[in-house]
Amino acid sequence: MMTPTIPVALFDRLLVEGISPHELVRRKLMCLFNSCSVPGGETLPPLLTRGMPEWHEVNVGDKRVLNWFCRELRAAILRYEPSINMLKVSVKDAHHQTLALSLEAMLQDESEPLRLEIAYSNGRWR
């Protein structure tokens, strides 16, 4: 017998009364950055899930590689979070020991963008 499923978005609305849409998406993105896969079994880009060990293999001086990574990350985020209409992902700082990203997202029914600065540190994205 099949059990009916309730969309995750419904749970989001029921559990987060009083939390702004910006804060809700920020929390979801932080969970995404610190997980190995998203619901539905889709895997995330290796750099997002493995962080610095994977980063050491990337030529941080090559703008094409950094642009490729930003495109891959942008696509993964847009597949994961349907409330984002537009998203810009850019590398703020890239060295062999550091990686800092800047995300700017326009959410549905919101006039101000969500801006998120995120950095990989001590095995986690913060």
UniProtKB/Swiss-Prot annotation:
Membrane spanning stretches: none
Main localization category: cytoplasm
Keywords assigned: Cytoplasm, Stress response
Domain of life: Bacteria
GO molecular function: anti-sigma factor antagonist activity
Cellular compartment(s): Cytoplasm
Pfam families hit by this protein: GPW_gp25 (PF04965)
InterPro entries in UniProt: Anti-adapt_IraD, IraD/Gp25-like
GO cellular component, one term: cytoplasm
Iron in keyword set: no
GO BP, sorted A to Z: cellular response to oxidative stress; DNA damage response
Cytoplasm in keyword set: yes
Function: Inhibits RpoS proteolysis by regulating RssB activity, thereby increasing the stability of the sigma stress factor RpoS during oxidative stress. Its effect on RpoS stability is due to its interaction with RssB, which probably blocks the interaction of RssB with RpoS, and the consequent delivery of the RssB-RpoS complex to the ClpXP protein degradation pathway.
Subunit structure: Interacts with RssB.
Family under the similarity heading: Belongs to the GpW/Gp25 family. IraD subfamily.
Listed name of the protein: Anti-adapter protein IraD
Species in which this protein is naturally found: Salmonella choleraesuis (strain SC-B67)
Gene: iraD
